[in-house]
Structure formats: C-alpha cells, structure tokens
Amino acid sequence: MSDVNSVLRKQLLNGAAQMGVAPGERQTEQLLAYIREFEKWNKAYNLSAVRDVTQMVARHLLDSLSVVPWIARSPYPLARMIDVGTGGGLPGIPLAIMFPEKTFTLLDSNGKKTRFLFHVKTLLGLDNVTVENRRVEEFAPAGLFQGVISRAFASLQDMTEGCAGLLAPGGIYLAMKGLFPEDELVPIAGKIRLVETVKLQVAETDGERHLLILQPQEP
C-alpha cells in the first residue's frame, strides 16, 4: 500500500468512526477506489472545485457518509432511492457502497459526469446502481422511488416541485443542506411537511450540516 493510500485509508476510517459509520474491508476499498478515480477524472471532467484528494475525502466522502446512520435506522422502506443532480456521484456512490441491498439511480444532465459514473459503476462492480443522463423534468422512471435524496438543489421548493413525479406514495425527500434553511420552508408550507431535521456531525468539517426529511402533505 502506498503512503498516500495509507493516509487516505486512515483519514476515511477515522472520520467514519467519529460519525458512527463502520465500512467493511470491501466497502473501504471501494470508497477509496472511488475517490482516487474521482481525483483522476476531475482534472479533465471538472467534477468538483476541490482539487486536493484529502479534502475530497473530507468534503465529499465523509459528508456523503454522514447520512448513513439515519438511513440505516430509518422507519421508511428505502429500498429504491434516487440521487437527483448527483454530479460526480455524491452522495449516491458512497451510499450505494454502504447499502448494497438497496438500489440507487443516479440522475444528472451533464454527460461528462454520467460518463464518469458509468466508469465507476463498472470498475467497482456496483450492480445496485443505475446511471441516467437526463434532466429531472425529462426523466420518466419505470418505477417510483421511496427516497429522493440530493445535496445539489438550490432550494427545497425546487427539489420538491422538480422531483414530485419521482416519489412513491409514502416516500420521503432527503435534502442535504448546510445551515438550517428556515426561509426555504416558507414557500412549501401547506404542500410539504418537515418530518424531521437531523443535525449532521461531519468529521473534519466545521460548518453546520443538516439533513431534512420531507413528505408531501396529505390531501
């Protein structure tokens, strides 16, 4: 194992442990292989403004893994999930690695980014991942999703309106946010209810992070 790989492995496992996440050996190798490919492809495909690989572990991998404890204990049956505006596969690829029993559709309109995702899916043998190169308003899935997750949407209104046609009855939106978006709840009041707010503890990150669980209001 190279010194760089050893450092990244230690950083990943220590950070994950601080958040109560314990990837197995195969999952650890897959997560590290993913971030190495992310760094390599980032040079040409501009997957992220972050260039340093240790920062990628902190700001991409650990941030994505911070929602694992909530999903693992969720009372909702999240067997079918979609990551909308996934970009380079965040949080979808790390979650697909951690939850091989669930299926994840990764949706993005950027062809360069979805080419990277097809490559990673094949390289890592992620049979539970489907990649879709489409805009959300043009995507007509064969089946609806129990969980719609994203860390990319500008607002909760954009997310819940844009993804309304993807959510199965009884399903939930999982919105990953920085500061608690108080103002974003106003435009969706009466249509969408805030089920739960989770203050995420993201290792190696000082700023606030929140996971908002949302559901359409009963008519």
UniProtKB/Swiss-Prot annotation:
Keywords: Cytoplasm, Methyltransferase, rRNA processing, S-adenosyl-L-methionine, Transferase
TM spans (from-to): none
Alphabetized SUPFAM superfamilies for the sequence: S-adenosyl-L-methionine-dependent methyltransferases (SSF53335)
GO cellular component: cytosol
Catalytic reactions on record: guanosine(527) in 16S rRNA + S-adenosyl-L-methionine = N(7)-methylguanosine(527) in 16S rRNA + S-adenosyl-L-homocysteine
Domain of life: Bacteria
Compartment(s) where it occurs, according to its Swiss-Prot or TrEMBL record: Cytoplasm
GO MF annotations in UniProt: rRNA (guanine-N7-)-methyltransferase activity
Top EC group: transferase
Family: Belongs to the methyltransferase superfamily. RNA methyltransferase RsmG family.
Biological role stated in the UniProt entry: Specifically methylates the N7 position of guanine in position 527 of 16S rRNA.
Protein name stated in the entry: Ribosomal RNA small subunit methyltransferase G
Lineage start: Bacteria, Pseudomonadati, Pseudomonadota, Gammaproteobacteria, Cellvibrionales
